[in-house]
């Protein structure tokens, strides 16, 4: 059963393959569909399942979205919705989203724009944030263990008391990022990061248990990755 409608295997299509022009009737299931850059006209999307749908650049300004499940749907500054619809508190992920305490474990957030978003206490363990825009974002108290932030833009990102065990920061831009109060960096890899010059010494004063923990993915320790960032004269 999908919703309250019997499942007809002859006409069934995978949710992620559903295109806007195929929508008809009730119980719309478009989980994981790519609707980026689409103009959805005046579609009735009330109570639709749009979880994980890519809505970046999507025109939803004439669509009815009341009751739609938008958890983990991706949007950007070009996404438009009907006046009065609160996209930022809908569970969707994008710039300005209110995601305090959100469960985003293992989520695919590659290249997502989260500037202006609030993610305090968010559960991001194992999430892939490669190439994400996290400039100025507050991640205080977040669980970022095993998270992938390769090449992410983390300028002035506030990591507060977050957990960074085995996080992969390789190639990330950490200019002015606040890392002084993080709970742990055990096994985290900072190889090829930029912007950490003024914090390297402070981070290398953390416990040996954190600094010498082996990261089986990047095949190195936190200490080695931080020391590799030091200029020859340091």
Residue locations for each model-derived region?
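Tandem repeat scaffolds
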Residues: 3-234
């Amino acid at each position: 059963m999908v919703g309250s409608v019997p499942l007809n295997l002859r006409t069934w299509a995978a949710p992620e393959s559903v295109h806007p022009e195929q929508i008809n009737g009730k119980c719309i299931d478009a989980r994981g569909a790519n609707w980026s850059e689409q103009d959805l006209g005046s579609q009735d999307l009330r109570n639709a399942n749009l979880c994980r749908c890519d809505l970046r650049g999507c025109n939803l300004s004439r669509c009815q979205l009341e009751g739609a499940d938008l958890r983990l749907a991706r949007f950007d500054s070009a996404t438009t919705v009907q006046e009065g619809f609160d996209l930022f508190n809908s569970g969707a992920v994008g710039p300005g989203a209110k995601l305090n305490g959100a469960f985003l474990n293992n989520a695919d957030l590659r290249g997502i724009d989260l500037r202006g978003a609030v993610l305090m206490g968010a559960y991001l363990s194992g999430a892939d944030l490669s190439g994400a825009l996290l400039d100025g974002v507050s991640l205080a108290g977040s669980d970022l263990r095993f998270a992938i932030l390769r090449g992410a833009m983390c300028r002035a990102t506030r990591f507060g008391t977050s957990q960074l065990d085995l996080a992969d920061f390789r190639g990330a831009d950490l200019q002015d990022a606040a890392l002084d109060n993080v709970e742990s960096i055990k096994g985290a890899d900072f190889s090829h990061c930029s912007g950490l010059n003024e914090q390297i010494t402070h981070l290398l004063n953390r416990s040996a248990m954190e600094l010498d923990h082996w990261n089986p993915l990047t095949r190195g320790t936190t200490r080695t990755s931080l020391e590799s960032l030091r200029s020859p004269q340091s």
